[in-house]
Amino acid sequence: MNRSINLALIGASGVVGRKIITVLEKRDIQISNFYPLGFSTVGNEIELKNSKYKILDVESFDLSKINIAIFSAGSGVAKKYAQTFVEKGIYVIDLSSEYRYVEDVPLVIPEININEIKKLEKPTLIANPNCSVSQLLLAIQPIHNELSINFINVATYQAVSGTGKEALSEFENQLSGNEDINVYPKRIAGNVIPQCDIFLENDFTKEEMKIAWETQKILDPNIPVQSTCVRVPVANGHSEAVFLRTENKTTKANIHELLMQTDGIKLIDDPSNNDYPTPYEHANDSEEVFVGRIRVEEINDENWISMWIVADNVYGKGAALNAVQILECLINENKI
C-alpha cells in the first residue's frame, strides 16, 4: 500500500523533541513530509535524515498538510492545540500528562496493549505514558501475566533530564559552583530530593499518583500501587527499585526466563561479578529497559519479588522511543 506519512512534530527543539528526531532516523521511518513546529524557536533549523527544516509557527500552520502529529511540548500546549488537530482528521501522539487520565483516550505501550491501536476507527488522540511507568510496566507485565501481581511498591530515582533543558542547565551550573536554585525546590547537585512534581492533599506527589493511575489504567485497575519518587543528581536515565507481591510462587530462574523472552528487556543480573544496570552505563540513547538485582523471597507466607530497573528516560522507552513505536503501530495497522 502506498501511503503518505505527513508528520508534524510540536516541540521539535526540546530535549525530547530532538531525541524523537534521532529515533525516527535510527528506525528509518519513511516520512513523506516533515514539519517541525514551535513557538519561540520559529525560524530555527532542525535536521532530519540529512535534510534541514525550518521550525514553523504552530498558530499559522496549515493542518491540511499532515495526517499525524507528535506533541512534545508539555501539557499546556497539548491542552490548547491537540484536540483541534484531531478534529481536522489528524492522529495525535501526546507525550504530556494532559489526556492520560481521560477514560476514552488510549494510554499505550505497544508491547503491552497494542490492541488499543488496532481497535481505533478514526483519527484520535493517543497518550504516551509517564517515563517511569513505561519502563516499570515493560519489565513487570510478563510477571503479572504469569504470577498475578497483587501489590506494587516502587521507589524511583529520576534524572534531571526528565524536567527538561532548564533543569539540566541549572544542574550543570550548580556543578560549576553557581548556587542559583530556580527549577527545583532545593539544590539538585550533590543532593537527593524526595519530591517530583507538586504535593497533593494526600501527601503523595503528583508524579507518585501518576505512577499509580497509569499502572492501573494500562496493566490492571485492581492492583494497589504505592510509590516514592526521588530526583537524583544524574543527568540522564531513570532508575527504579521495585517490590512486587504475587499470588503465585516462583523462582529467580523463572523470572530470568520470563524477562529474557520479553521484547525490549535486557537482563543484567550477575551479583557475584557486580553486574547490574546503572544509568551511567546503560542510559545512553539506549532502547532497552535494563533489569537486574532480582531477588525472590517468601515473607509471612507472601510471595515477593524485588528488582532494579534502569532506562533512558528521554531517548528510550520513557519518551521518544515509545512515541515513535506508537507511530510505527499506526503505520503498520494501516491507520494512516
Show the residue positions of the predicted features.
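N-terminal Rossmann-like NAD(P) cofactor-binding subdomain of oxidoreductases
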Residues: 1-188, 224, 289-290, 294-300, ...
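Charged docking surfaces used in two-component/phosphorelay signaling
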Residues: 69, 160-336
